[in-house]
């Protein structure tokens, strides 16, 4: 048992711009009937979220889901957050934004490579405290903000704005593309997971 979720993270929006952008996206989702207008549905470990709207079926692929089904709430996070994929979120590698080479965290037998995760762990702690969260690349020696590193196997993403869809079937590619457009062309991360 558990709760499945999908997250869209805006990696570029500033802390100051996160709430206004979130309000515009929520207004669009409400106008399209994808979610309800008021936060009334409980979100696991948080306050209320937006209930699924009458047109939810237009933005999801429910072909593998038995009937009847009902989508859970949408949680909108508008604060600096490390979003994760829940259970078993253990990335294999991360790609440097400068040289584009991967820093591997595990060897071919999936044993942890000693010290490989340390720069990321330190950067996460710094980032969560409001710092830049710089990570020095083991290959090119350049330091880059944690939010600019890619990969991480869909396990982690960092940003000031995230939308978590609880208990929804897979979001359609067309919906995800329109969602990205509504975020103003910012870099986004899409993750799915389970708690």
Predicted regions and their residues:
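Residues immediately within or flanking Cys/His clusters that coordinate Zn2+
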Residues: 91-93, 134-137
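Short, non-ligating residues that shape and space the ligands of small metal-coordination modules
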Residues: 104-106, 146-147
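Short linker/helix segments within small regulatory modules
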Residues: 112-134, 152-153
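Transmembrane alpha-helical hairpins and terminal membrane-anchor modules
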Residues: 135, 145-146
């Amino acid at each position: 048992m558990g709760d499945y979720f999908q997250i869209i993270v805006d990696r570029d929006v500033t802390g100051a711009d996160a709430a206004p952008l979130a309000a515009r996206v929520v207004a669009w989702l409400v106008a399209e009937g994808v979610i309800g207008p008021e936060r009334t549905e409980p979100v696991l470990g948080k306050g209320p979220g937006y209930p699924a709207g009458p047109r939810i079926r237009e933005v999801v692929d429910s072909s593998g889901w038995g009937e009847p089904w009902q989508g859970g709430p949408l949680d909108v996070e508008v604060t600096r957050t490390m979003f994760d994929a829940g259970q078993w979120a253990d990335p294999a590698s991360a790609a440097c934004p400068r040289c584009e080479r991967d820093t591997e965290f595990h060897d071919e037998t999936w044993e942890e490579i000693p010290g490989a995760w340390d720069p990321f762990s330190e950067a996460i702690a710094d980032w969560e405290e409001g710092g830049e969260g710089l990570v020095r690349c083991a290959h090119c020696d350049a330091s880059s903000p944690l939010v600019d590193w890619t990969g991480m196997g869909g396990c982690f993403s960092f940003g000031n704005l995230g939308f978590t869809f609880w208990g929804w079937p897979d979001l359609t590619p067309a919906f995800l593309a329109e969602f990205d457009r509504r975020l103003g062309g910012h870099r986004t991360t899409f993750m799915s997971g389970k708690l």
